[in-house]
Amino acid sequence: MGCLDVRFCRIIFALYSLIRKYGAWLVIPAMLGGAAFLADSVLTPAVSISSAVEGLKTLPALEHLFTENKDLTMMITAVIIVILFAVQSRGTESIGKVFGSVVMVWFAFLAIVGVVAIGNDWSVLAALNPYYGIKFLFSPNNATGLALMGTVFLSTTGAEALYSDMGHVGRGNIYFTWPFIKVALVLNYFGQGAWMLHNQNNPELADAEGINPFFQMMDPNVRYVAVVLSVTAGIIASQALITGAFTMVSEATGLNWMPHLQVCYPARTRGQLYIPVVNVVLCVATLAVLLLFRDSEHISAAYGLALTITMITTTILLGIYLWHRSNKFGAVVFTIVFLAIQVLFFAASMAKFLHGGWFTLLLTLAILMIMYTWNEGTKLERSQRRHMMPKDFLPALDKLHGDSRIHRFADNIVYLTSDPDLKRLDTDIFFSIFADHPKRARAWWAVAVETTDEPFTREYSVESFGTDYLFRVRIRLGFKVSQSIPAYLHQIMHDLEKTGELPNQQSIYPKLDADPGIGTIRYVVIHKALMPESKVSGRGALSLQIKYAIRRVAGSPVKWFGLAPYNPLVEVQPLFVSTRRPPRLTRVASQAPKREG
C-alpha cells in the first residue's frame, strides 16, 4: 500500500482522504481503524518490551531473582517504558540511523538460532504444507477450537509496525527487506516448533511454569545475547508505533477529528514529529496496561483484537479505492479474500474478550468517541458560520472608525480566524466589534495562520480593502517555525507603516517593547458555546458539550499562538440562538407584602 504515494505517511487516513468523496459512510471505518491503531499504540510498547524482558527469567544466573520477586519483570519493563517516552521530546533522528542495522542483526539472529534449533526435529518442516494446519484446526485434539486462530494471528503482529513509521525508514526500504524478514520469522518459528517436538516428553519440563520456547531453544550462553537484542527490537517496535501515533493524531487534527494540539518537530523533516499531550497520554495508558495485565501473556489477549480491527477497516477502505481507481473485478476479489481471512481472525480474537479483549474495545471506543464528537461538534459550528463581503461591512466600520464620540478600545484590535480567504470577513468578528459597546480602533486586523509542508517558510499576505483601518492577514509558517503571532504581527504592522498603508500610530503611552509608530494592541479570541436558549438537538448538544470539555483539556489558541502574555480578551458567542425578539413581559400593579399575624 505504501501510503498510496502521499508525501508523508498518513496510514489509514491517507486512504480515507482519497476516497471520502465516494460516500459519507466511509468516515465510519476510517475513524474506527484510526481509533484501533491508537489503541494498538498503547498495547504494543507494553507487550513487546515485557515479553523481551521476561527472557531474563530464562538466564541461569538471574533465575533465582525472578523466582523470589514475581513483579521484577514488570518493574523493569515500566522503567524502560518511562525512559522511552521521556526521550521522545529530543527526537529520534540520531538514534534512528542505527535502527536499520539493529533490526537487520535482530532478524539475522532469529534466522540463525531457528536453523540451529530445527536440527532437533526436522519433521517440523512438514508444516510448510497447509494441509496439516487445516487438519489440526478441525481435529478433536484441538481443544481450543476456533480460538486457536487468535493465537496463530499473534504470529503476524508487528507487520503494522513495519509501515507505521515511514517517517524514519521509508517505503522502499520496507518493500526491499520484507522477504528477508518473512524468511527469518518462519525459520525461527520452525526452530521453536522443532524444540517443542523434541521436548514434548521431557520430564524436566513437564511441571515447569512459564516455558518460553523462543529462549529455551537456545544455549544458555546465547540467551544473554537474545535478551539484549529482543529488548532492543521491542524498543524499536514501540518507537515505530509511538511515532505512528503522533502522525495519526496530527492527521486526525487535519481532518477535524481531534483538537488542535501543540506539535513539535525535533527533526529536520515533517514526517518526524512529537506531540507532548499525546506522549503523556500514551505513557500513562501504557503503564496502566502493564499494571492491569502484569505480564505479556495476559496483554497479548488484548493485543490481537486491535490489529484485526485495523486490518479489516483498512481492507474496506482499500477495496473502495481499488474499485474506483482500477479493475472492479480485482477489487472485489481482493476485498472478499482478505476480509474472509481477517474476519476469521477477528472472531477468534473475540474469544479472548473476557481475558483482555474487553480492554481493547473499551480503549478503541473511547478514542472513537473523541473523534466522532469532535467531528460532529465542528460540523455543527461550521453550519452556523457566516461570512460578509466588503459591501456589507465596510460602511459600518468606516462610520465607527471616524466616530470620535466613542473612546478607542485599543489602537489595534486583532482577531484570530481560521478562514484563509482574504476577500471576506467572519460575521463573528463583525458582531464582536459592534456588540454592546462598539470596539473602536485605529485599525482592525483579522489574522489567519497556515502551516506549510516546508520547514522554514515565513511569509504573509495582506488585503486592506482600499482602507487604512481594516486588514485581512494570512501568515504562512513552516512546520519548524515558531507560531508566536505577536512577534510576526509587530513586523507586519511596522512594514505597513513604512509603506504608508498603515498610518503612524505613535501611542501617548509608549510600551517598552513597542515598534516605533505602532500603538497599543489588543487580541480577541472568539469561542463558540451553547446557551440555555440554544435550539439544537440532544445529540448535537451532547457532541458540542463533549467537544468543549476536550478543548478545555487540550488547550486554546491563546497558548498555541503565544498570546498569554498579552492579556487577550476571550469572548463567547452563542450557537443556535434565535435572533427573534423574546415574548414581551406584561406589567402588573405592584402589591404590598402581606403582614403575618
From Swiss-Prot:
Q: Does the keyword Acyltransferase apply?
A: no
Name the catalysed reactions.
Answer: K(+)(in) + H(+)(in) = K(+)(out) + H(+)(out)
Name which cysteines form disulfide bonds.
none
Membrane-protein topology: Multi-pass membrane protein
Record bears the keyword Transmembrane: yes
Question: Keyword set for this entry?
Answer: Cell membrane, Ion transport, Membrane, Potassium, Potassium transport, Symport, Transmembrane, Transmembrane helix, Transport
Intracellular or extracellular location(s): Cell membrane
Q: What is this protein called?
A: Probable potassium transport system protein Kup 1
Q: Which GO terms fall under molecular function for this chain's record?
A: potassium ion transmembrane transporter activity; symporter activity
UniProt xrefs under InterPro entries: K+_transporter (IPR003855), K_trans_C (IPR053952), K_trans_N (IPR053951)
Q: Where mainly located?
A: membrane
In which family does this protein belong, per the annotation?
Belongs to the HAK/KUP transporter (TC 2.A.72) family.
Report the transmembrane regions from the record: 23-43, 72-92, 98-118, 143-163, 174-194, 226-246, 273-293, 303-323, 329-349, 353-373
The entry's function note states: Transport of potassium into the cell. Likely operates as a K(+):H(+) symporter.
A cellular component term from Gene Ontology for this protein is: plasma membrane
